[in-house]
Amino acid sequence: PKVGIRISIEGLQETNDKIRGIPDGFNRGYNTLKTLVEMGHPDVGFGMTVQDMNCEDLVPLYHIANDMGMEFATATLHNSFYFRKTDNRIDNKLKVAKNFEKLINELLQSNSPKKWFRAYFNHGLINYIYGNKRLLPCDMSKNAFFIDPFCDVIPCNGMAQKAVMGNLRNQTWDELWHSDQAKQVRECTKKCERNCWMIGSASPAMHKYIWVPGWWVIRHKFLKGGKYSLSENAYMKKDLEQQ
């Protein structure tokens, strides 16, 4: 089956084990991924949620994943009903952004088109950290969705309150997807102003509005020689001047 496996590893060993609070968690996660690679699984990798505590491990962890031929997925702190958090925040935005900048340049220097588009996704994470409107429209509940462990189908896991379109235990897919309840939830998502930037909602948008990330990739990979700078972002001017 086409199943991708990601294990959350929040940095190098000391950082990861401190954040996760799991004894020897880094080695356990790393060895699990290594075993899957040795077994020939085609789609395994790290998933890292970047924050103040671990941002300096971002590029080193990418290098570990890259050297092993694994995928490297990134995210940053979000608040939502699903995460049961309302106080997640990044204090030193510039420090975190600078480490994303380093990662973006690493990705742009690769020979992988997939990584070039991941560079754009990480550019979007910087934009999100600074509290801006998301780079692309969100169409969750229309062209993508999330299924929670209780079989509730919801638009995504980033909303302030849970909005259920239906439940797969009680309804067929067609009944659920075309129900009045689903239509009401779509109206809610249309008005959502959270501007979250997670791969679950960003990836479908990047495919639908491909010309936007496509032009960004052409500009940075080919016209700028694979280089990206935080100074391109007008909203960062004040922070960059004060550093």
Where are these regions (language model features)?
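Flexible mid-to-C-terminal extensions adjoining Fe-S/redox cofactors in radical SAM and related proteins
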Residues: 135, 157-243
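Radical SAM enzyme [4Fe-4S]-AdoMet core and its adjacent flexible, acidic
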Residues: 3-10, 14-154, 158-167, 209, ...
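Generic secondary-structure transition motif, activating predominantly at the C-termini of alpha-helices
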Residues: 1, 13, 20-23, 66, ...
